[in-house]
Amino acid sequence: MFREMRRKKQKLTEKQCIDILKKAKTATLALHGDDGYPYSVPVNYVYLDGKIYFHGAKSGHKIDAIKNNPKVSISIIDQEDVIEEELTTYFRSIILFGKAKILQDDDEIYQAVNALGLKYCNDEVAVEKEIQREWKNLCCVEIIIEHLTGKQAIELVK
């Protein structure tokens, strides 16, 4: 179903991929957009219990795209060091494929947005206040990961 990586020496382990998912701050979410065009958008997210969660408004391009087709892809660049004298980039990145689901259960939504808030802010009181302030306008999306892979520059392979 998913393609195998051609350059297997450069493939990251599953643990390396998950470590990147846990520490990265921003990902690019790719969706099936309007009129057959791809739609990609940066999102803040949290990796929790083997799934990806992000939040946003209850309506808009992202939510419409997910409702029309739940198949998504996420990419994250972990490292991108341009080495001018070698005319190359020492990179490390991951890509995942999965299915997005708009959460309906208040407990699931709260758990996800609380974890998301605490990923970016250590102040539990501030996170709780923000959740309460935005709750009625909040939409939370869960991505069930179906395929996860990562790759790094050959120069980084040990």
Where are these regions (language model features)?
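Structural motif corresponding to alpha-helix initiation and N-cap regions
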Residues: 14, 59-60
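Charged, gly/pro-rich active-site loop segments
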Residues: 2-9, 81-158
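Short beta-strand segments
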Residues: 24-58, 74-75
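Helix-adjacent hinge/juxtasegments
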Residues: 55, 61-91
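A generic structural signal for nonpolar/aromatic side chains embedded in well-ordered alpha-helices
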Residues: 21, 65-66, 116
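Extreme N-terminal tail/first-helix region
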Residues: 1-23
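Broad gene-expression machinery/nucleic-acid interaction feature
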Residues: 26, 40-42, 71, 95-97, ...
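Short solvent-exposed loop/turn micro-motifs enriched in small/polar/acidic residues
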Residues: 22-24, 37-38, 87, 136
